């Protein structure tokens, strides 16, 4: 950890950081913000007066935003504070089905498509103002449609191309169905982090009496694509 801190002290920030937690990702966004506030207040104390680290330490990095809907069911993205010149990180959970909205008196649960559209609305509101735009999408939108079989659409590749065309420089996700989909955007940043280690830590913590040997434990891959995780 000390080596990481030392490396961080020698690295200049790209720009003052701001964090947008979409409605689908509010709780996780708040946890990330709380960690950032604590981490930055407890480390790198020698740089407080440097203009290169303006707004490095803050009581909150969250940006107030919303995606209100018209009576027709259409929506718009609103940033309620300036993000000009910032290194903007936008977090969204496209699989949060608990959120609802009303159209003509009918209650609708938000689908991944709805969450993706709201993400693009916020990106559109920030384009041309933020110094850099990064998207954190724990579940990669349309990641299961990463290749074409017969006459099918290439939804994941199209989504990645669309985001980068709107000005997104980096896309961060976890356990993408096939990380090779990043070939659709070879000149942009794409990171897919594998979580098996975190899964095992959580499993051992939740089941402390778990016996790990060839007689009592078997790890099975649901398909060929997940074999590397099981191994």
Segments (PLM) and residue ranges:
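PRPP-associated nucleotide enzymes
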Residues: 1-231
